[in-house]
């Protein structure tokens, strides 16, 4: 998506501002008695408190998007041995960064970008669009589940530098079945392992909040030893969340409108959209957003 250009006043305000989340939800990742669905339902419930109803739209509508985010939520993902905290914008449910147990914030972006997080965050060194995280691969290639989330949390919690840790992790994982793929990925991109872990969390948490279909699919296979993946169609829908939200506003004014790009996604009307999407992005502001953790790739 298009990146924003912040005014000097915006930059100063963000630099001096300490983020205070509206709420923090804790998810004990390895607790088999705590369903993924319960975690997502709890976070959605708190997000909806900050949403509005819009005439003609079935789903709750998120707060208006701001150049400098005003509303945040945190989710703390805890394993038996470690934890990380995800910082998510309330106005668009984009993951902006994560905090390690040592208190270090890692933020999507690179030198020269504008920090959105406080507490002296460090740049991850790459952006947060799906194109940045998985290249041209489809989201159906992302394997998720309780075990995948556990590994992601444990690995990301140990992050200390931009590249050296990823190289160490790849060496440690060379005995795994996918060792050849990991080695090839590391040779091409030293941060490939970090990107792989982050995209799993983005889909399971952020897209799980946005999409009914995603949360149901992930929940159904969350405890599977083999993990769970989205369908090709679900993956394409996820990457068009912004466009689906725009369509929801169009259908609010013109209920019988035929929207070709929605038909290509298997969404014929607002009833079908409501079955698929749980939370709609507010379209009443023309504000463009910064590239953050799970931007739609519509405008890439």
From Swiss-Prot:
Its main location: cytoplasm. It catalyses: Endohydrolysis of the N-glycosidic bond at one specific adenosine on the 28S rRNA. The keyword Thylakoid does not apply. It comes from the Eukaryota. Its EC number is 3.2.2.22. PROSITE patterns: SHIGA_RICIN. It is found in: Cytoplasm. Pfam families: RIP (PF00161). SUPFAM superfamilies: Ribosome inactivating proteins (RIP). Accumulates to high levels in seeds. Keywords: Cytoplasm, Hydrolase, Plant defense, Protein synthesis inhibitor, Toxin. GO terms for biological process: defense response; negative regulation of translation. The active site is at residue 207. It is an enzyme of class 3 (hydrolase). GO terms for cellular component: cytoplasm. GO terms for molecular function: rRNA N-glycosylase activity; toxin activity. The keyword Zinc does not apply. Monomer. Possesses features of some constitutive defense agent. The coordinate Opaque-2-controlled synthesis of this protein and the major seed storage proteins (zeins) may provide the germinating seedling with both nutritional benefits and protection against pathogen invasion of the surrounding endosperm. Belongs to the ribosome-inactivating protein family. Type 1 RIP subfamily. This is Ribosome-inactivating protein 3.
